[in-house]
Amino acid sequence: MSEFYKLAPVDKKGQPFPFDQLKGKVVLIVNVASKCGFTPQYKELEALYKRYKDEGFTIIGFPCNQFGHQEPGSDEEIAQFCQLNYGVTFPIMKKIDVNGGNEDPVYKFLKSQKSGMLGLRGIKWNFEKFLVDKKGKVYERYSSLTKPSSLSETIEELLKEVE
């Protein structure tokens, strides 16, 4: 079993969100922020989620305040912002650190599987993305500049793969 499925972050309500419930799904994990130039990506992320959720795809957002202090709100405020401004219905987790001594185990795992540009492991900014296949393998890592809508073809390919 992939180490991915042993992870269990905490959701915005403080409840465990065990990743073993994601077995057989294609998962896009994104570190998100409410006051970032990339925040409008929420709209494309939600469109991707709605398009593929019934085919075995999900998105998980991890709010993070490590880049320019662009996610200052409480978990409840963040969830409200996402819902009111972008109609977000995909799961949003509790605010975490994605780098440094307090980095969340989810990001420690993801970064150990796929390094970023120039082989660097650290998350560079908000809205960096990790695409995980149906077997829990980190398939690809995308920079903040990558538009969520550009991932459709890859998501479709991964959804077609037999487990």
UniProtKB/Swiss-Prot annotation:
Disulfide cysteine pairs (residue numbers): C36-C82
Catalytic reaction(s) noted: a hydroperoxide + [thioredoxin]-dithiol = an alcohol + [thioredoxin]-disulfide + H2O
Superkingdom: Eukaryota
Presence of the UniProt keyword Oxidoreductase in the record: yes
Broad enzyme group: oxidoreductase
Gene Ontology molecular function, alphabetical: glutathione peroxidase activity; phospholipid-hydroperoxide glutathione peroxidase activity; thioredoxin-dependent peroxiredoxin activity
Knockout consequences: Sensitive to hydrogen peroxide and tert-butyl hydroperoxide (t-BHP).
UniProt keyword Lyase present: no
Main location: cytoplasm
GO cellular component, one term: peroxisomal matrix
Active site: C36 (cysteine sulfenic acid (-soh) intermediate)
Annotated keywords: Antioxidant, Cytoplasm, Disulfide bond, Mitochondrion, Oxidoreductase, Peroxidase, Peroxisome, Redox-active center
GO biological process: cellular response to oxidative stress
Compartments it resides in: Cytoplasm; Mitochondrion intermembrane space; Peroxisome matrix
Enzyme Commission designation: 1.11.1.24
SUBUNIT field: Interacts with YAP1 and probably YBP1.
Note: Present with 8000 molecules/cell in log phase SD medium.
Name of the molecule in the record: Glutathione peroxidase-like peroxiredoxin HYR1
Organism encoding this protein: Saccharomyces cerevisiae (strain ATCC 204508 / S288c)
Lineage: Eukaryota, Fungi, Dikarya, Ascomycota, Saccharomycotina
